[in-house]
A protein has these predicted regions:
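Conserved SAM/SAH cofactor-binding pocket of Class I
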Residues: 32-126, 149
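Mobile active-site "lid"/loop adjacent to the S-adenosyl-L-methionine
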Residues: 117-146
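SAM/dcSAM-binding transferase cores
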Residues: 198-242
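Class I SAM-dependent transferase core
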Residues: 1-38
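General small-molecule cofactor/ligand-binding pocket signal
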Residues: 15, 92-94, 185-188
């Protein structure tokens, strides 16, 4: 492993492997999207937590947050990060499979669930199942329905599910959410530039909720190549990243 330790503005440190999948803007946008809707008394679970960035970004907003990660190296780094920050009482890292949440966690125990899942459909097993980056990007070890069914199992009645994904899969996402009684309540599209087609979508769904969807103003990431817009700069600042 090629490790580096980064310090967030909050003072928390995160250990990352430069040769593996390091956190990017997706995790920051998802954390901020959830941040505006969760409460201090809440407890949550992050499905596919990777190196634990989402628990680290949300830890001061909640009572407790658990990160579930199937890849052993990523889970170990997440555990080292929480120990480095003395956050063992507020964050728990569990090494396990999203498809096995029923054997790992109590049913309907969490106020919210977050997930930054693999976006791309696996191309008939072409991806290497041992490749950490392939696992993070493609549905090698879990599919969209696995993530959504796990969220339904974990959430309390009226609990909230926050996910970031690709807009081209929106119809599939909404169909699957409603299949598991998770009603889409809030959505925000994300585009790289003002003239670009959206390439990300943030979704909040609530368990057993009435049907009414709020579309939030689109997030434009870059003002010009390499320069974040004022809105994205504000998001990074709010999440104590820059």
């Amino acid at each position: 492993m090629n490790l580096q330790t980064d310090t967030l503005l909050s003072g928390y440190k995160i250990i990352q492997d430069k040769d593996a999948f390091m956190f990017g803007i997706d995790a920051v946008l998802l954390s901020n999207f959830a941040f505006s809707s969760i409460k201090l008394r809440d407890s949550g679970l992050d499905l596919g937590t990777g190196n634990g960035i989402i628990p680290l970004l949300l830890v001061d907003k909640v009572v407790h947050i658990t990160g579930l990660e199937i890849q052993e190296k990523s889970a170990e780094l997440a555990q080292k990060s929480l120990e480095l920050n003395n956050l063992e009482e507020k964050i728990q890292i569990v090494k396990g499979d999203i498809k096995n949440v029923q054997t790992l966690f109590a049913k309907h125990a969490y106020d919210f669930v977050t997930s930054n899942p693999p976006y791309m459909i696996s191309e008939h097993g072409k991806e290497n199942p041992a490749d950490e980056k392939a696992i993070a990007r493609h549905e090698v070890l879990c599919k969209l329905e696995d993530v959504i069914s796990a969220a339904e199992y974990l959430l309390k009645p009226h609990g909230k599910f926050f996910m970031i994904h690709r807009p081209f899969r929106l119809a599939e996402i909404f169909n699957c959410l409603q299949k598991y009684k998770l009603e889409p309540k809030r959505m925000c599209l994300v585009s790289p530039f003002a003239a670009s087609e959206p390439n990300l979508v943030l979704i909040e769904a609530r368990k057993n909720a009435q049907s009414r969807l709020k579309i939030e103003p689109e997030i434009i990431v870059y003002e010009k190549p390499g320069v974040y817009t004022e809105r994205v700069k504000a998001i990074y600042k709010e999440m104590a990243l820059k």
